[in-house]
From Swiss-Prot:
Keywords: ATP-binding, Cobalt, Cytoplasm, Magnesium, Metal-binding, Nucleotide-binding, One-carbon metabolism, Potassium, Transferase
Summary of the tissues where the protein is detected: Expressed in roots, stems and leaves (at protein level).
Gene: SAMS1
Main location as per UniProt: cytoplasm
Protein name: S-adenosylmethionine synthase 1
Domain of life: Eukaryota
Amino acid sequence: MAAAVDTFLFTSESVNEGHPDKLCDQISDAVLDACLAQDPESKVACETCTKTNLVMVFGEITTKANVDYEKIVRQTCRDIGFVSADVGLDADNCKVLVYIEQQSPDIAQGVHGHLSRRPEEIGAGDQGHMFGYATDETPELMPLSHVLATKLGARLTEVRKNGTCPWLRPDGKTQVTVEYYNENGAMVPIRVHTVLISTQHDETVTNDEIAADLKEHVIKPVIPEKYLDEKTIFHLNPSGRFVIGGPHGDAGLTGRKIIIDTYGGWGAHGGGAFSGKDPTKVDRSGAYIARQAAKSIVAAGLARRCIVQISYAIGVPEPLSVFVDTYGTGKIPDKEILKIVKETFDFRPGMIAINLDLLKGGSRYLKTAAYGHFGRDDADFTWETVKPLKWEKPQA
């Protein structure tokens, strides 16, 4: 590749599990998991908000499950590491408010006919449009800028919890800028331009120690050496002080980190959040199947990069539209790829739930609620399974 090649910079960010918005996502999904574990037909729309010494869960839940919401809130906070006021929240002594009502009967009869409908007849839980995206620039078929930002956040938590960096506290943010080359519509990462980490810390540590530890224990194990050079810029706790964090530092809300949850600013987003929603909510199940479709297209060699959009009307099972764009990287025309996608994937919400096994609780959704819903190597992330697509390579 010539040195004078045209490149551009693209940035993705992430936050780790102690960020107040992410804390809320995890509580909402922990509630969903608990409901589905006892009653797979649970209808859940659970929101969470938090501020100093307070967590509130609110929303609409119709379930046969017997769920202790307060216990789930405290356990989730505890597991993240919010065990005292000085780290941002005290799981055992904070105030927990619960305002949960039943799903509106108007919505219930329109979506699932009060549970009288067969799975293929279940309508979408709401209107909306969702996107799935995939790119061949990483083994996960995800954007590199997003993958690196996400892995830095996960690694920050790992070295906090295993004691490698005892000065760390739960809250933290990461951001990675990658220099790319556009190869006829496909994205080719050349180098990491900038790495930014802002992490909550205790009073004992100096900024120099923070920078040294982050380079050695967080950045080095995560970012492959081939992407770093002498020109790579590092901003490590650039504000100079981040002792107050978690809900004490900022208020948190479910559904405020939807780009971090998906593709780090690549592709597109229909605006609907994931956490705290059961699979009849197409904001979640639609985005999951759209990712599976896009990933399968790239994995099959049909394209190097791809976006899939689907849209729904409330109460209607079939999608209103399906759209595929391969950014000019398709081996066959996009309209032919679209035909293959429509033949291979069942976009009806009830069938998505069955085909991707989305009615299973446990800690399944809690796992998705931090460090991204896509590109994860975990059997519970069923939408990451590539479906084989039948197509003929065009004759040269």
